[in-house]
Amino acid sequence: MPTIAYHAPIQTLVAVRGHPFDRTAFDAIFQGMEGISATMVDQPAAAQLMNPDGMTPYDALVLYDMPGLDFEATENRPGHVDPGDAFRAGFSALLEQGKGIVALHHALAGWPAWPDYAEALGGRFLYRPGPLRGRDRPDSGYRHDVAYTAAVVAPEHPVMAGIPPLFPMQDELYLAEMFEADVTPLLRARHAFVADAFHSAAAAMEGRMFDNEGWTHDEGSNLIGWTKRAGNSHLVYLQPGDGQTTYDNPVYRRLVENAIRWVASMSPRKPTESRAT
């Protein structure tokens, strides 16, 4: 059991829950980061901290959560849960303040009832068809354990420091909504992002896992990593992160660490009295 790193120069809040994951294996990513302390908080409690007051002790927020989806809904699964006015106001204020954010993998599906959340992250994974940016969009696609090559497209960016130009990955990929015009691309996947290569998320909700029969989707973006401004915050999204194969990948660990260090360096400094002495 890791101890509490009160004196770590970078304090990070890591929001989790909403999608299955191996907590111990995921936490090991952060235990290997020198000078970074990660405090893991489950949703829905994590949402109570996502405001300027709640995030005062932290230099960065990592999103590995998937809030706002009710998988026990009796119809139209998953149901969409409204985040509430208090969360919307607090999270918006956090972005206005400029707190750095790193969003990973399934975080792209979070808070589907709040369009501004997708705008902040730079995209949306849709579990069922619905409106997005004024257009009706199909449900998104997923494909587990895809062996592919990831390609760095912004080698000079600090998040790409020490990352090889090309590196192998084996992870889940999404055929989802990426707002490419609003982001700075960092990573692309060499893979065919077409409906035939993915499974329907809505079919999975109907009990038909790994099925795309009758499902159609436009050809999608191969973008799997980007940075953007969300209000005054610097945000990095990394699409990989489905399970232990990726958690243990040293290149992935370097990506996550680089992203945390970069967004923390771009965040407003904490008050001196909030640091451990």
What spans do the regions from the language model cover?
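Short, solvent-exposed loop/turn segments at secondary-structure junctions
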Residues: 19-20, 67-68, 108-110, 165, ...
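A glycine-rich, often tryptophan-bearing local segment used as a flexible ligand/cofactor-contacting loop or short
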Residues: 68-162
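Extracellular ligand-binding/catalytic regions of CAZymes and related secreted enzymes
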Residues: 2-9, 204-277
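Helical hinge/lid and interdomain linker segments adjacent to catalytic or ligand-binding clefts
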Residues: 9-15, 23-103, 107-111
